Amino acid sequence: AYEMLRSLVGSEMCIREELEEADEDLSVSLFGTLIDSLTAAGYEHYEISNFCLPGFHSRHNSSYWTEKKYLGCGPSAHSYNGTSRQWNVASLNEYIRGISNGNPTFEVEELDLYTRYNDFVITHIRTQWGMPLPKLRKQYGEELYKYCLRMATPHLQQGTLEIKNDTLKLTRKGVFISDGIMSDMLWVE
C-alpha cells in the first residue's frame, strides 16, 4: 500500500541491506490483519489509511474528502476555495518577510473541470462513504459521469468496486489495489 521514501531511516537501512522491505503479499496480509483487528476492536475503517472510534474522524482530513473550503496559514500551508488551490512559500524567512511587507508569497493553481473531477475521484473513492453518483453527475456533467462509469465497469465486474445506494465504493478487495483503480478512473488527456 505504501512505499518507503528515501529520506526515511528505514529506507536507508534497506539500501544498506540491514532491513528487508516486506514483499507485497506479506504487506497485503499484514494490512488485512490490521483492518480485521481494528474493526473487531470497534474502530471504523473510514478511509484507506485511517481508522477511528465512532464519531472521532479526523476533522482536518475530512475537509479534503468532503470538498470543504479551507484556509492554510503559515509557511508551506495550503488553502482551497472550491475553484483553486493556493500554497504559501516554504521558507519561514521569506514567509515572514512577505507578511511584514504586506505582500505574502504564494502560488495559485486554478482548477479546471477535469482537475476538479480527478480530485473528486481521488478523495471520495478512498473513503467508506464512497463517491455519490448523483453528485458526480450534477457537479461534473454527463460526459464525466459516463466516463467514470465506463472506467469503473471492469472493476465492478472484478468485484473491486461496487455500487450501493447510488454510491460507487471500493470493496475490501479493492482497498488493496485502490491506487490502480483510482488511476484508471482519472481523466487523462
Protein language model features and the residues they cover:
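A short, conserved structural fragment
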Residues: 156-166
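Short, amphipathic alpha-helical interaction segments positioned at domain boundaries
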Residues: 173-189
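Short amphipathic alpha-helical interaction segments
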Residues: 142-156
